[in-house]
């Protein structure tokens, strides 16, 4: 049975209360990957996958999820500034549907609006060269996406009195 693909808050209800989450920033040429600690407080970068074929990319992502004992996936959804979904969001949803057929890990979709721009500004502010930025931006965007999702879940947990 395919994994559920849900908005972040609904996906969180499917995940156990603790356990690592894998965060993904899906690009046309690369996939940035981040992982949380089991308590879901901190996101750290794992790697940038150079995209080849869906089968190859999915195999690497699921191997990372297994290695990190992940209990769920957070996929950045590139929503337009007017809250509509364009071709990139549709492509991300298609990737999620295909990935869901290969795993039982619930997939949470998280609004990634401006994540790459925010990361690029931060890297520029830290005087990271253009060449180095190109190599690390997708992994850092995955960190940004996953940390945003973790922070949102932490706020919700505090407001509901959960862990």
Curated annotation (Swiss-Prot):
Annotated localization: Cytoplasm
Keywords in alphabetical order: Cytoplasm, Hydrolase, Nuclease, Ribosome biogenesis
Signal sequence interval, chain numbering: none
Broad EC category: hydrolase
Documented EC number(s): 3.1.-.-
Domain of life of the native organism: Bacteria
GO terms (BP aspect): rRNA 5'-end processing
Record InterPro entries: RNaseH-like_sf, YqgF, YqgF/RNaseH-like_dom, YqgF/RNaseH-like_dom_sf
Family: Belongs to the YqgF nuclease family.
Protein name: Putative pre-16S rRNA nuclease
Organism, scientific name: Rhodopseudomonas palustris (strain BisA53)
Taxonomic path: Bacteria, Pseudomonadati, Pseudomonadota, Alphaproteobacteria, Hyphomicrobiales
């Amino acid at each position: 049975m395919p994994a559920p693909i849900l908005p972040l808050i609904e996906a969180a209800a499917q995940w156990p209360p603790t356990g690592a989450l894998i965060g993904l920033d899906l690009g046309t040429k690369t996939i940035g990957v981040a992982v949380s600690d089991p308590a879901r407080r901190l996101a750290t970068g794992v790697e940038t996958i150079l995209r080849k074929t869906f089968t190859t990319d999915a195999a690497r992502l699921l191997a990372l999820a297994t290695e990190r004992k992940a209990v769920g996936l957070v996929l950045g959804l590139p929503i337009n500034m007017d809250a509509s979904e364009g071709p990139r969001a549709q492509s991300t949803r298609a990737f999620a549907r295909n990935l869901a057929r290969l795993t039982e890990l619930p997939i949470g979709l998280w609004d990634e609006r401006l994540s790459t721009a925010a990361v690029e500004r931060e890297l520029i502010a830290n005087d990271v060269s253009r060449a180095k930025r190109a190599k690390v931006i997708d992994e850092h965007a995955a960190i940004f996406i996953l940390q945003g999702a973790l922070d949102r879940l932490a706020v919700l947990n505090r407001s509901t009195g959960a862990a």
